[in-house]
Structure formats: C-alpha cells, structure tokens
Amino acid sequence: MAVGKEIKTKIASVKNTQKITSAMEMVAASKMRKAQEGMAASRPYATNIRNVIGHIALGNLEYRHPYMEERETKRVGYIVVSTDRGLCGGLNINLFKKVLADAAEKQASGAEVEFGVVGSKATSFFNNMGAKVSAQISGLGDSPSLTDLVGSVAVMLKAYDNGEIDKLYVVYNKFVNTMTQDATIDQLLPLPKSDDEEISHRWDYIYEPDANSLLDKLLVRYIESQVYQGVVENIACEQAARMVAMKAATDNAGDLIDDLQLVYNKARQAAITQELGEIVAGAAAVG
C-alpha cells in the first residue's frame, strides 16, 4: 500500500492548503467591506471640492487657471494604481494592458509618455519594461491616507506646471461589484468640464483672501483626492478579486480531494482484492 500512503499524504497536504485559502477568502471578504466603507466615505469630499471649483470658475470668468486650459498634447502622464501583493487574479495585468494600449495610441500620434506608479506591482512592471517612471510609491497597506500620496502627486503636478507633461490621467480599477472590477482611465488635467460649468448661472460669493488663491489650493486638493479615490477603489477591487480567487482555489482543492479520495479507495480496493486472491491461491496450494 505504498501508493495508498502517498495518496493519503497528498490528500492531507491539499486539505492544509484548502484551510489556508479558505482563511484568506474570509480575510479578503472582511477587508473588502472595510474598503467599501472607505470608498463611500471619500466620494463626497471630492464631489464637494469639484462643485466649489465650478462655482469659483463661473464667478470669476476673467481668470482661467492653467489646470483648466487645454494645450497641445506633446507629453502625457499616467498615475497608475496597482496592488502591493498578488493572489488577486488578473487585476493588475488587465490594468497594465489598458494603460499600455492607451499610451500606444498617444505615442502613435506623436506624444511622449511617462508614469507615476502606486503599488509594488506597477513599480516592478514599468521599471522592468524600461518605461519612464517619474514617481513611485508602494507599501501603502490596506488603509492609506491622503497624505501618503501627496509627494508622488506633487511630482506629477510639478511636471505639468513646468510644461513637461500636457495631460495627466489616473489609472485604477473601479469597483462595480464583487465579481466585476473595471480598469479605468480618468483625465485629471486639464480639468474636464463638469455639468456645473456647462450652465450660465454665476454664483455671487465673496472669497477670502481671493478667489484665485483659493482656486489654486482647491485644484491641487481635488487632484490629490481623485488619486486617493482611485487608490481606495483599487483596494476594494483587490480584496474582491482575492476573495473570488481564494474561493475558486478552495473549491478546486475540494474537487482535488474528492478525486484523490476516489483514487485512494480504488487503490485500497485493488490491494484488498489482490490480498484475497493471494490467500485463496495459498489455501488452494496447501489443500
């Protein structure tokens, strides 16, 4: 029964792996719920800032901030949000394919591209492919704060201010539901027009110290909050993808255990049959 012992060892090994994947599935589910709460909490902040920016812009039509002005696109920047860890299916690779396809279109029209990367997966991917990486950060954990991202965002904003890039995008996985995560590219700069800016109503507010200074600060905060929102959404997507991947691994382990158990039972039955045959043959020989 040497074969039977090997199969029993394999079954025990797969059962141990199944326990690990099952535990990881439960942990990912818990973290996903927490990430969803953070995602929902951060949305109103960015929305309200965007509304205030629209109000100031409408009330101060003689001043156009550089972040609101379209210019010829010679250089494009992408802030790519990825995960620090794996075991989350094709979440990262699908995102990288999306941004590389978009970057290829920009390059085909004569534009240069550069990247700011968030997460160790994007850091290693874009550095290994020899892309121009202007800013990088990783190790944010499951509960990052907006201040963690300020430095990397500032590098890309400075490049925009200096005319080193003419358009800036944030690339992340958008959380739709547990089973669906969409690789998304949102334009940050120049600031896309909102519905508020399409209307002709002007708001009569008094700003201190002045509207222009306030607009400068708010636009930077808005860009930071949009990147932060992308990071939070990506975390929710990561945990959802990991939960699904670990559930699939747990289910596959169960199927493998059933198959191995069947093989073990057949091997055991064959061994018993062989032993009985030998006993009968021995008895016949003695008789």
From Swiss-Prot:
It comes from the Bacteria. Pfam families: ATP-synt. One of its GO terms (molecular function) is proton-transporting ATP synthase activity, rotational mechanism. GO terms for biological process: proton motive force-driven plasma membrane ATP synthesis. GO terms for cellular component: plasma membrane; proton-transporting ATP synthase complex. Keywords: ATP synthesis, Cell inner membrane, Cell membrane, CF(1), Hydrogen ion transport, Ion transport, Membrane, Transport. The keyword Cell inner membrane applies. SUPFAM superfamilies: ATP synthase (F1-ATPase), gamma subunit (SSF52943). It is found in: Cell inner membrane. It is a peripheral membrane protein. F-type ATPases have 2 components, CF(1) - the catalytic core - and CF(0) - the membrane proton channel. CF(1) has five subunits: alpha(3), beta(3), gamma(1), delta(1), epsilon(1). CF(0) has three main subunits: a, b and c. Produces ATP from ADP in the presence of a proton gradient across the membrane. The gamma chain is believed to be important in regulating ATPase activity and the flow of protons through the CF(0) complex. Belongs to the ATPase gamma chain family. This is ATP synthase gamma chain. The gene is atpG.
